[in-house]
A protein has these predicted regions:
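DHp/HisKA dimerization-phosphoacceptor four-helix bundle of two-component histidine kinases
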Residues: 20, 78-81
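Short hydrophobic/aromatic patches at helix-to-coil boundaries
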Residues: 2, 93-96
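Short, positively charged
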Residues: 2-50, 56
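Structural signal for well-ordered, non-membrane alpha-helices
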Residues: 33, 84-87
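Heptad-repeat coiled-coil/leucine-zipper oligomerization helices
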Residues: 42-54, 58-61, 65-68, 72-75, ...
Length: 96
């Protein structure tokens, strides 16, 4: 089911149509709005320039989160492999 949600970003209203929940849509819009406002507060920029810089900041955060997720997946895999080795060793020792 498609949800239609009106959000305000940088003072402009947008109608977003998405299968995501209204709460999720609003949360995303708020994140974008807050990032644009932070960029504008740091430097006097046009809405377009502030939007581009905010998008760059969000993209950087996204890629850092992906990298962190990849690192966690590798750690989990390593722990699972170590767990398997330790279980095998434990079983071997129990058979003695």
């Amino acid at each position: 089911m498609l949800n239609r949600v009106v959000v305000t970003i940088d003072g402009l209203e947008y109608t977003v149509v998405s299968e995501d929940s209204p709460e999720s849509i609003r949360r995303s819009a708020n994140l974008v709005d807050e990032n644009i406002a932070a960029v504008k507060q740091a430097a006097p920029l046009s809405s377009l320039s502030a939007s581009v810089l905010a998008a760059m900041n969000l993209a950087e955060s996204y890629y850092k989160a992906l990298e962190s997720t990849d690192n966690l997946r590798r750690q989990i895999k390593d722990y699972a492999e170590e767990n398997g080795r330790l279980r095998a060793e434990l079983n071997r020792l129990k058979r003695r």
